[in-house]
Amino acid sequence: MRKILFTVLLCIGVLNLHCSKIRERKVPEFMTAKRPTPELVYQCAKHYKLQHINIVVAQSILETGHYKSDKCINYNNLFGLYDSKNKKYYRFKTWQESVKAYKQKVQYKYKSGDYYAFLKRIKYAKDPKYIHKLKKLS
């Protein structure tokens, strides 16, 4: 009987310790942030394993006018991602989804080399000075 009681108490103690460790794990700040900042976009891009993160963050700043544009505020679209099939800008539930979509819709095409040249090659932006502006920000 004592062995059973000891085993039960030991199991309860181990379970409590395990549960407290789960509670201690914190959700990364960027996951719960309602509004993007360069630092949070950087963390999110790193989490999703985007390449050339500094350039991607600069794109988010440039595309949204420092996160103040209509597309950023109302669509959570940090990169001006456009659905050419439906002729509409993508709408995301969260800005974090926009970062994830950037990897899926833009970076999947990138293999290696100069990222600025890649953006120019895929005609990411219509503005002929886009790369120059991006370099100033990144």
Q: What is the meaning of each model-derived region?
A:
Residues 1-23:
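Bacterial Sec-dependent N-terminal signal peptides
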Residues 17-138:
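Catalytic cores of secreted/periplasmic lytic hydrolases that degrade extracellular macromolecules
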